[in-house]
Design a protein with these regions (language model features):
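Short functional micro-motifs and their immediate structural scaffolds
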Residues: 69
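C-terminal segment of N-terminal export signals and the immediately downstream linker at the start
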Residues: 13-14, 35-62
């Protein structure tokens, strides 16, 4: 897949950090406003998560509004029990995993139950890294079979390879592939259960 280049208006590192801080602040402020609207009866738990969907076809990130397939880097999707997102069936979707983590954590704080999270699996695709405007941007992959369950991946961080919103988590379902990536690109590996909003905001 060819890599999409960034336009002159693409987010800078300061823009990215400001955006992520804004997302975190906005979702935190919303907790009190939504808490009283939730029903007392929990949604029944699902034993198997829904299958991932394509993030192509002009789908725009639920956090920043950018068209997911038009930008490089990992993308992700989160299915929730109940009617979230409220404007459509299916998952919430994001063009970066930093946004996904912050939004998912905030949804959990509002008593939303994630029943399936999927992220780009760079061990399952023939990815490219392209230098554009001084950045080394990894390719985007949006077909359903390019996603892996969140907890089945290990994440490369602090690598110097970026995605749609700058530095991001780079998921691999195969640890050997992840270790080879870090050996070539720098950084370190983080397990899924160690990924927090504080971590992604610090990247």
């Amino acid at each position: 897949m060819c890599h999409h280049t960034r336009s002159p208006e693409a987010p800078t590192e300061n823009d990215r950090r400001a955006f992520l801080r804004g997302v975190a602040a906005a979702t935190t402020v919303g907790l009190g406003a939504t808490a009283g609207c939730l029903g007392d009866d929990p949604e029944p738990a699902q034993t198997e998560p829904p299958a991932p969907v394509s993030l192509g076809g002009g789908k725009a990130c639920d956090a920043c509004g950018m068209v997911i397939a038009d930008h490089g880097g990992p993308s992700g999707q989160v299915f929730y029990a109940g009617d979230h997102p409220s404007d459509r069936d299916g998952p919430a979707w994001y063009d970066s995993l930093a946004e996904l983590v912050i939004e998912r954590d905030a949804a959990v704080d509002r008593d939303r139950e994630p029943v399936g999270t999927y992220v780009t699996d760079y061990a399952a695709v023939d990815y490219e890294i392209r230098e554009t405007g001084g950045d080394r941007i990894i390719s985007s992959h949006v077909a359903p079979d390019t996603f892996v369950r969140w907890d089945e991946a290990v994440y490369a961080v602090e690598t110097g390879v970026v995605g749609a919103m700058g530095p991001d988590l780079l998921p691999f379902s195969d640890r050997g592939a992840a270790e080879s990536f870090v050996e070539a690109e720098g950084g370190r590996l983080v397990e899924a259960d160690a990924v927090t909003a504080d971590l992604v905001s610090s990247l």
